[in-house]
Amino acid sequence: MLGPDQFRDVSDFQVPQVVLRLEKVIPSDPTLLNDAVAEITAELDCAACWDDVEIIGLVVREALANAIVHGNHCDPEKTVSISVAVNEDCDLLMSVKDSGAGFDPSALPNPIAAENLLAPHGRGIFLIRQLMDEVDFKFDHGTEVRMRRRQNWLE
């Protein structure tokens, strides 16, 4: 194990090449959500890496909806950006960024707790965390949700 002032030489690491990259910026208008999700999932479907592109579409929908509704409060003057990359190993890397003030992910209520089961909101981040291998948040001039799903995530 390396100490706090030691660094591993990463020059010999093999980094898979990106074979598909999508970047899209949309106004924070919920009526544009379906078209944006359809466009992104169609491109990913063409990459032919997954049999379950619908699940990835659900993640895209939830991440974009959270950014539009909760991050930017449906203000069409504010934008949401999404960046999607697929590498040669068919790993999916995705980032969704809004202009919102941010939030504390650890403070989100448990959506499967009895008192929250019928709540109209509160399942998006939970679903994203369940369906992706890695999810983290960055708060710098907005909120960025960064997600990764490995091709072999079910193995």
Question: Which residues fall in each region the model found?
Answer:
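Conserved beta-strand-loop-beta-strand hairpin that lines the nucleotide-binding pocket
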Residues: 1-24, 68-155
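Helix-loop-beta hinge of the Bergerat
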Residues: 17-50
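Short, structured helix-loop boundary elements
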Residues: 30-34, 53, 57, 77, ...
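Alpha-helical macromolecular-interaction surfaces
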Residues: 35, 55-58, 91, 130
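Conserved short strand/loop->alpha-helix "switch" segment adjacent to the catalytic nucleotide/phosphoryl-transfer site
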Residues: 38-65, 117-119
